[in-house]
Design a protein with these regions (language model features):
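Residues at beta-strand starts and edge strands
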Residues: 1, 35, 53-57
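Short beta-strand-to-loop capping motifs
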Residues: 4-10, 61-65
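Amphipathic alpha-helical segments
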Residues: 6-24
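Short, surface-exposed beta-strand/loop "edge" segments at domain boundaries and coil↔beta transitions
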Residues: 13-15, 37-41, 63-72
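Short Gly/Thr-rich strand-loop-strand
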Residues: 27-33
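A short, structured beta-strand/loop element
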Residues: 33-52
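C-terminal structural segments of small proteins and small subunits
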Residues: 54-81
Length: 82
């Protein structure tokens, strides 16, 4: 399964999220592994929203559907519960 999303968080926060997961391994500062899942992070230009410029990162998760969905669920719990 491949899941690509644009997260409205700075690259540093996305990296901190993956580094904070005990069972996620860091290959490079923008590539992580979780079981069968490979995670690639790409920094995007900020989205212009009037006077605000929201920082964004493209997150691409590829691997077994169960692993991709579990990691995505963790992200939702972390960032949507704030």
């Amino acid at each position: 399964m491949i899941k690509e999303e644009i997260w409205r968080v700075p690259l540093q926060r996305a990296v901190a999220f993956f580094r904070g997961q005990e069972d996620v391994m860091e290959e490079t500062t923008r590539v992580f592994r979780f079981r069968s899942c490979r995670i690639d992070l790409s920094e995007l230009k900020p989205a212009s929203m009037g006077i605000w410029a929201a920082k964004r990162v493209k997150v691409r998760m590829e691997g077994d559907e169960v692993d991709v969905e579990e990691l995505h669920h963790r992200f939702l719990l972390q960032f949507l519960s704030m």
